[in-house]
């Protein structure tokens, strides 16, 4: 409905109100103008005389009411006519939009069919070249999966990837980008260093906003992530142009040859930061930011993005088997490399120099137990259904406060807990959530570390209390006890179900069970499940023993070999 149409309707309603309040005489009511306005509102496309006849009849009815002094009936009729006009205008607007949407869908469908036919013809005629890949995006390849067979999709994907590999092999300079949304997900530092050490490579970290949560949360996270990488000396580019409110194109930042992805949830990236809008000339590699454990196997293995990655370097052989089982394209593009983030646990390094653990002045520092508290974001109705933070968050704070001489704590909240706790009403605002974190930071024996690497925190700790999902697998690399806080909504994938069998567990709302874990298992060193954890680790997680090298080197060498083979 246009402003002019809305103004016309409001004018008729005002006339009715003025007549009712005797601010306007009924005989001064502009009946002919109102009748004409109703005629235009009805405006039946296929029967103009009918709309004119109906409006004239209503006009005659109002004249009759005026002539007989029927003020209440006249006002009611004017209001009814205004409401009818509003309905007709809104119906027309809806139909016009629907018609426009259908027309756009038809045009998009025609264009999609053209793109599909074009890439299939290029493949069959063996004419896939660099120019074609520069001109098209991964939306075109996604159409092959949608409209063609899985086998055709695999064949054309392989052709696209081989064309890219040959181009990369010819280049003197290879451009490598790491695509991140949050420093807490950063797991590829060793891979970054391997490429950065090569004179024939240009390496950059690209940061994009991830549209989950409030605007404040989205852009606070985005700006903090850029600051994190910049301050640590990484070559860093923000993809969001705040002056024009848009996402920069990949050409603007130098057209990378290979992009490493850490997060597969492509629908939360907009514009050119969505993989569907990446040019086909980019070779996409996915290294999961966390260990896939919970039960959403579709989200973990069968999003459209999973099918558009050249290679997925997964955590374990079990995860490769799950890809075969749950993905539309099987394990076609999946390689079991081991989990890059865990490489540092295989290196003999001195104790971290970072000042992680705060100690109360009167604490016996030699005997203080260092405990990580890692709450997940999915409290209450949150999608994953793992979070228990809302049940015990104040009890955990008070317990840390009351045991200041015996314990030291790091609160490591999930990156999305800020958004999740506000969305679920636990805190009324981001500021209130931040005030809670400040309470922890003010304790003499606690510190909040929201982002950045956490391997050194794991190494220097004694135990963890958590419902954060990926940490359930990752903390096994330090061979220390952890308490998993459960709830009825917990679901696990194939790997997670086996993992859950060898964990200390307590109901997420049972604070007394949490205290017993700290006092008995941690302080008294009664870790009676150690052997079960070690057996699980050897069977599933010891990738260094299986591959004979760190995961970062395995990935680096795999990609290098693939490039060299096509020369």
What are these regions (language model features)?
Residues 187, 191, 196-197, 340-435, ...:
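Conserved catalytic-core segment of nucleotide-activated headgroup transferases in glycan assembly
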Residues 241-243, 424-470:
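Donor nucleotide-activated moiety binding/catalytic core segment of transferases
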Residues 20-32, 46-52, 66-75, 90-99, ...:
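Charged, low-complexity interaction regions
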Residues 13, 79, 84, 88-91, ...:
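C-terminal amphipathic helix plus adjacent low-complexity
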Residues 285, 449-493:
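A donor-sugar binding/catalytic signature common to diverse glycosyltransferases
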Residues 2-38, 42:
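Short terminal alpha-helical segments
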Residues 64-67, 103, 174-348:
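Active-site and donor-binding regions of nucleotide-sugar-utilizing enzymes
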